Amino acid sequence: MRAFHGRTYGSLSATFNKKYREGFEPLLPGVSHVSYNNIEALEKAVNEETAAVILEVVQGEGGVYPASAEYIQAARRICDERGALLIVDEIQTGFGRTGKMFAVQHYNVTPDLLTCAKSLAGGVPMGAVLIGPNVKNLTPGVHGSTFGGNPLSCAAANAALDVMREEDLPGQAAAKGAYLVEKLKKIESPNIREIRGLGLMVGVEMKQKVTGYI
């Protein structure tokens, strides 16, 4: 629930919010949405016919909800037991924002596929899918893209990755995120329901609509 994975046909099918889906149906059949951080619901939803479980380790569009370690580790176990792939969507969380290069590293879990984009090339449009050894049938030439491997985007990505490593942007995000949360908690406002997040990906949930605060 609350998942947002994109606006193209496949990713939109896995996106929960109806406002994005309306006008584009029918979408891909066989997609089920499961309550986030609910291991029991995930156990019931995944079976031997399930191709993959796709999730965000921190739901961004859904309200900055981090997954529990138990949930992510259970997802890995369930996928292994039932022959499904574990796909982690790191479009928003990847490349240091949460205090590690990839948010899934906080959970000591290795996904089968990891999607990344946005900050990958420092704002220049670029996306990538990282695959592990369980994805055996995806070989060079199986998938193609008109704009794939764009030289400008690749050069921008190389430069951005150099800066991330040389300036330790993940470490900076961890330190600054901890500082931000510490200061936010000191506000102690009766209007704040919850402060949550991971690294520098932090959300403040208010008890009323936020229109009046922005």
Task: Please place each PLM-identified region on the residue numbering.
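Conserved N-terminal phosphate-binding loop of PLP-dependent enzymes in the Aspartate aminotransferase
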Residues: 1-214
